[in-house]
């Protein structure tokens, strides 16, 4: 009877910076390289593998073997540990749509570096106009007293973001359509702080309009109520502090004043740094 050793059910959560690094490594690959591989860094907690960083592993794939610069990978991992000790090896990544014949050989190396490494593939060829992301774990297969092998089994994978990453992604989305519309600027600068407040307020008003429309449709029996949405709205109402309009206006104006003070101080520091740089350059030129 054959035996199958299944690892824990895992969910892989990938941060956008990891995907950007993989695409960047693919764009910088050697002309004779068909695909690029590398190490995934992150953490594992309660069946969730969170991938927060990665780096490229130089390698060459031949018909019957794989050559990889393992010393380079070890040195780079040690350097990363000095910066962020919480990021450990959780698996490896490769560009392409599918698992290749060499994947099992590469996976054996990472199985020695961590427990149950995950394998992430990113379709950089944009098949179907999408950059497909897949994740796998290696399942051990074998017959008692006989040969053993492994099989890559797909697992759940999703993209997650921290709040600063969401801001960066929203800024990147503003560059969509630049090539198709030559009149649009090719670069996008971050908005000023007050402009961000205005933009966030407009989005909040739009969301409130959707919520009000949903509540009115439920009250007029045009739409069936959902308990999950109702509980979420109730929690939202309870989270709002009980204050009058004047109290809210006073609190808001106080926060705006603090924001303006921070912006003013930031501009002063920026001006001083620019002045110091010019004075330093002038002094060096005179000497």
From Swiss-Prot:
Residue ranges occupied by any MPN domain in the UniProt entry: 12-142
Keyword Cytoplasm: yes
Localization of this protein: Cytoplasm
UniProt xrefs under Gene3D superfamilies: Cytidine Deaminase, domain 2 (3.40.140.10)
One Gene Ontology term, aspect cellular component: eukaryotic 43S preinitiation complex
Keyword vocabulary terms for this entry: Cytoplasm, Initiation factor, Protein biosynthesis
Signal peptide interval: none
Single Gene Ontology BP annotation: formation of cytoplasmic translation initiation complex
InterPro entries: eIF3f (IPR027531), EIF3F/CSN6-like_C (IPR024969), JAMM/MPN+_dom (IPR000555), MPN (IPR037518)
Highest taxon, organism lineage: Eukaryota
Keyword Cell inner membrane assigned: no
Annotated GO MF terms: metallopeptidase activity; translation initiation factor activity; translation initiation factor binding
Entry's family note: Belongs to the eIF-3 subunit F family.
Subunit organization: Component of the eukaryotic translation initiation factor 3 (eIF-3) complex.
Protein task: Component of the eukaryotic translation initiation factor 3 (eIF-3) complex, which is involved in protein synthesis of a specialized repertoire of mRNAs and, together with other initiation factors, stimulates binding of mRNA and methionyl-tRNAi to the 40S ribosome. The eIF-3 complex specifically targets and initiates translation of a subset of mRNAs involved in cell proliferation.
Name under which the protein is recorded: Eukaryotic translation initiation factor 3 subunit F
